[in-house]
Amino acid sequence: MIVGIGVDLVSVRRMQQLLERFGNRFTTRAFSEVEIRDSLQYKNAHAVARHFAKRFAAKEAYVKAVGLGFGRGIEMRGVSVFNDALGKPRIAVSGDVGHNVELSLSDDGEYAIAFVVLHV
């Protein structure tokens, strides 16, 4: 049974501006160690911005699906987005509430989008 749906759209350009302006101060507050480590595989700033934009969109879509929002029991770093061995995007949540999570990520170069479905 579906218990929540969330979607979010993030500007890759805006993410790149945040990364340029705040650097590690931003990434260490918003992203997990896994997400930061995974970003190291990219060689140019635009690819890094796309990586983080997709993950940021996934976090926002997840909290929308849960219906709580950040700061209401869910911390941004507590939601970690990664790819499994087959490349499928996954979400791990600190203090997981027991939902199964389906995640789809995409980008077109200018925008990143995430769609989350929670089910039991």
UniProtKB/Swiss-Prot annotation:
Q: Give its E.C. classification number.
A: 2.7.8.7
| Catalysed conversion reaction | apo-[ACP] + CoA = holo-[ACP] + adenosine 3',5'-bisphosphate + H(+)
Positions contributing to Mg(2+) binding: D8, E60
Entry-linked Pfam families: ACPS
Q: Name one GO biological process term.
A: fatty acid biosynthetic process
Any GO CC annotation of this UniProt entry = cytoplasm
Could you list this entry's UniProt keywords, alphabetically sorted: Cytoplasm, Fatty acid biosynthesis, Fatty acid metabolism, Lipid biosynthesis, Lipid metabolism, Magnesium, Metal-binding, Transferase
State the protein's purpose: Transfers the 4'-phosphopantetheine moiety from coenzyme A to a Ser of acyl-carrier-protein.
Name of this protein = Holo-[acyl-carrier-protein] synthase
* Organism the protein comes from: Anaplasma marginale (strain Florida)
Give the taxonomic lineage as stored in the record.
Answer: Bacteria, Pseudomonadati, Pseudomonadota, Alphaproteobacteria, Rickettsiales
